[in-house]
């Protein structure tokens, strides 16, 4: 194993190989850190809706093993439509140049919620004529509202081995769970974990927390839909026990 670090001192010539080392170490570190993560949102990319424009903040996305760095905000105009609109990120690779390979990404709105092989979803919304699109939420249950709100439950968020919830969803959950009466030790521990990790929590931890409360969903492993539904019930009813039945519903659009 060998690692080379350029010595940036006066009167020394900076060779092109040294420049490559500087380039590769900075990017290679991120590649190693996120090597076990699925495709999806890694950092940032906060979405705001204002005056008919969606603004996607700076951040990092992973797609097909490559990490895309967004160093500038992106803007996408929107307007009401008779149905769901999906904000998608689309990725392409350009190898036409002999000097470099270009990894490109763009954001756009699509009336089709299905995804092509080179796309991922950032959020979706159903904006009615005469209504205002919201990007903030009254409470955790409000995040599953169908109309006139940025819906994050379907967002592609990178996780270890499987996708996870958008950090905004879990931070709202911890905010409400943290002030709930009759909290158990596991509830407090989960809140601290969410706060310390800024909402970046793996799905396995949420399932374990729910199972510790005696909440199950039959014999199948709980997916994001079921986990969200059970979390909402905990906030609505307090610390519930017993088994969870599939007959209960939540607004969760695939």
Regions found by a protein language model. Name each.
Residues 4-8, 61-254:
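Beta-strand-rich solenoidal segments
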Residues 1-60:
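N-terminal "first-domain core" detector
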């Amino acid at each position: 194993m060998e690692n080379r670090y350029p010595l940036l001192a006066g009167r020394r010539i900076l060779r092109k190989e040294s420049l490559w080392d500087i380039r590769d170490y900075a990017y290679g570190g991120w590649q190693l850190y996120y090597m076990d993560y699925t495709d999806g949102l890694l950092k940032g990319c906060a979405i705001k809706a204002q005056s008919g424009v969606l603004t996607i903040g700076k951040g990092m996305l992973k797609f097909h093993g490559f990490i895309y760095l967004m160093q500038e905000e992106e803007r996408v105009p929107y307007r009401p439509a008779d149905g769901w609109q999906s904000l998608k990120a689309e990725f392409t690779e350009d190898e036409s140049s002999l000097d470099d390979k270009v990894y490109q990404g763009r954001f756009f709105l699509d009336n089709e919620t299905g995804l092509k092989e080179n796309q991922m979803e950032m959020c979706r919304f159903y904006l009615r004529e005469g209504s205002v699109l919201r990007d903030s939420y009254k409470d955790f249950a409000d995040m599953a509202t169908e109309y006139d709100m940025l819906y994050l439950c379907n967002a592609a968020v990178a996780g270890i081995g499987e996708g996870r919830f958008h950090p905004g969803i879990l931070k709202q959950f911890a905010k409400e769970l943290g002030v709930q009466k009759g909290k158990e030790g596991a509830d407090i521990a989960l809140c601290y974990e969410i706060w310390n990790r800024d909402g970046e929590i793996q799905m396995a931890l949420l399932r374990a927390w729910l199972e510790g409360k005696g909440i199950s969903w039959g014999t199948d492993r709980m997916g994001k839909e079921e986990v969200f539904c059970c979390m909402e019930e905990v906030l609505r009813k307090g610390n519930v026990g017993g088994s969870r039945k599939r007959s209960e519903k939540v607004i969760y659009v695939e």
